Amino acid sequence: MRQKTLDVLEFEKIKSLVANETISDLGLEKVNQMMPATNFETVVFQMEETDEIAQIYNKHRLPSLSGLSKVSAFIHRADIGGVLNVSELNLIKRLIQVQNQFKTFYNQLVEEDEGVKYPILDDKMNQLPVLTDLFHQINETCDTYDLYDNASYELQGIRSKISSTNQRIRQNLDRIVKSQANQKKLSDAIVTVRNERNVIPVKAEYRQDFNGIVHDQSASGQTLYIEPSSVVEMNNQISRLRHDEAIEKERILTQLTGYVAADKDALLVTEQVMGQLDFLIAKARYSRSIKGTKPIFKEERTVYLPKAYHPLLNRETVVANTIEFMEDIETVIITGPNTGGKTVTLKTLGLIIVMAQSGLLIPTLDGSQLSVFKNVYCDIGDEQSIEQSLSTFSSHMTNIVEILKHADKHSLVLFDELGAGTDPSEGAALAMSILDHVRKIGSLVMATTHYPELKAYSYNREGVMNASVEFDVDTLSPTYKLLMGVPGRSNAFDISKKLGLSLNIINKAKTMIGTDEKEINEMIESLERNYKRVETQRLELDRLVKEAEQVHDDLSKQYQQFQNYEKSLIEEAKEKANQKIKAATKEADDIIKDLRQLREQKGADVKEHELIDKKKRLDDHYEAKSIKQNVQKQKYDKIVAGDEVKVLSYGQKGEVLEIVNDEEAIVQMGIIKMKLPIEDLEKKQKEKVKPTKMVTRQNRQTIKTELDLRGYRYEDALIELDQYLDQAVLSNYEQVYIIHGKGTGALQKGVQQHLKKHKSVSDFRGGMPSEGGFGVTVATLK
């Protein structure tokens, strides 16, 4: 897009306002590079990108980007063998820190609001590399100003020696300056430093009383700064240690620089992404300041800007206008009084197009629609005086000639006071001819004029619409309201009457104008009245729509509250059911405990009625519809004695011993014999049943294939393990996982010793790494 157009539309001022919202030189650099795109996909992507960040910015407190800075020069220097200093390393550390903070913020945002998606920002977050190691390497080695003493063992030793030597020097010099005999010989009883050597200030006349080296003197020459000979060697030692310190610091910084070079590509990606985020957040901040909205871009040519206003004007006083190229309209001609807002309307349209194609939200109400223009051409400038009319006309015409050379069907052309600066009749003729030419090219055009001839232009050409800026004859001032579809009319008679001109003169003047012109003015006046009526109705419609939207929002909230209430009722019901299940589980444990005791008593008979009574006690705890399995049994031939069946309610196999009646049968499940409903039985193919003394009844309560004993006391853990193994056997599990944790190993040892002795366990082993490692024991059941 032409720079001249951007200058005329004052796009640089918009960029300056966006630049003020950036935090870093990275963001500022991107603002300075910001230009309107002309590719449709690029324009749409840039707008979506800004809108995503704006949505987040308007709802949440973003993490600070303070301290973010451009570090690519340091990274490249590190890559070619240079050594970075502490300050440069800290800027790189801050870049990583800002990245990590933003990534953490985004992850929390996504977790908290799973229903909202930010695909573009999500992609940027996925681009960010992991640089945790480099961050810690820098962070643990240096602070803001220098390397830590413990940055290396060698550095710590050197600095310790420097500190102890300095302390000895200070003690020696303190004795000298505090000596009563030396008080009158010293300019001041202090120890100071000259040329990196510890010295004392001695009066010049007492120089001979102090053996040592003079390093400096005062401006008056009255004071000499002497390094006493007693500390010369210690100061020399400090100098040597400082040299060693510098070498060690250089070594450490070289090592850290090597780490930076190794992560060069990752750091450059981080810099690019974080700079882009700073740029986008600056766009979002600026957009909020103008209450910007996201336009919808369309492939077909369209312009609809509801209640648009110029973003550089005071929003509290500027009049917002709806600018629209209605269907099949390619040219809009605005007429009306000077200083009525015609030029501002042109600039508003042009600047909003440029902003939108630069990825900035635009100052309109929601629902704006735009197409993407390859170029915007402007001939906009203030009128000059009559003495300058020739230069004015020549300047405009030179610009128009240049526009006509390049404009095409993908262009928006803005003409301000087209044909002005020359003879009115010739100017009007030129204006109409230029408009015809641009329409033939296929460009979208908005032009302002004060030529009355152009009012009739739209009535004999298709695709042309008149518009005007309103003038209030009562206040004798423009209202700055744009009236689409209504041409401007002369207000000379009304203004003259308002100013007190005689009615006789006004009426005589009216007789002097042509009938056609009089009829046109009356028609325009009628159009203005109709436009105001329609506008009033539209505002009322907007009000009703907003009320309807509010009602819809209220109903949606109430519906959501109802759903939440319904959910809470369901959760409450589930909780009650779980309490019953818990009671049933305890009852089942008691039954299993009884069965185990019966099984361990040699020769003890299991009384059927006792088992049936216990089963009934368990059944009483279950809700028929919500807890029992709703199993559709398969259809087979009629069940008879001797058939092998599956008991649906227990999930166990059994053999039919006797058909009691049409509804009940006696079934043997292992050592248990029970009377069951026939509808609870599913006929299976005959299989040879292995003789066993184990109880194979399955608890209806489904158990997991793993038991977590972490946190249990030793004795309680073994009791829990016993009960679990019994339930696992009844559930026909072949293998189970006992989680005991690593800890001291006492619980692991106790569990494995117990498994060795347990009758239901055939084998066990330690867990594989994928299964939990040493914290898990895997038991195989018989």
Curated annotation (Swiss-Prot):
GO annotation terms (biological process): mismatch repair; negative regulation of DNA recombination; rescue of stalled ribosome
E.C. code: 3.1.-.-, 3.6.4.-
Keywords on record: ATP-binding, DNA-binding, Endonuclease, Hydrolase, Nuclease, Nucleotide-binding, RNA-binding, rRNA-binding
Positions that bind ATP: 336-343
PROSITE patterns: DNA_MISMATCH_REPAIR_2, SMR
Any GO molecular function: ATP hydrolysis activity
InterPro entries registered for this protein in UniProt: DNA_mismatch_repair_MutS_C, DNA_mismatch_repair_MutS_core, DNA_mismatch_repair_MutS_sf, MSSS, MutS, MutS2, P-loop_NTPase, Smr_dom
Residue stretches spanning the membrane: none
Protein origin, superkingdom: Bacteria
Domain spans labelled Smr: 707-782
Protein task: Endonuclease that is involved in the suppression of homologous recombination and thus may have a key role in the control of bacterial genetic diversity.
Homology family: Belongs to the DNA mismatch repair MutS family. MutS2 subfamily.
Self-association state and partner proteins as the record states: Homodimer. Binds to stalled ribosomes, contacting rRNA.
This protein's name: Endonuclease MutS2
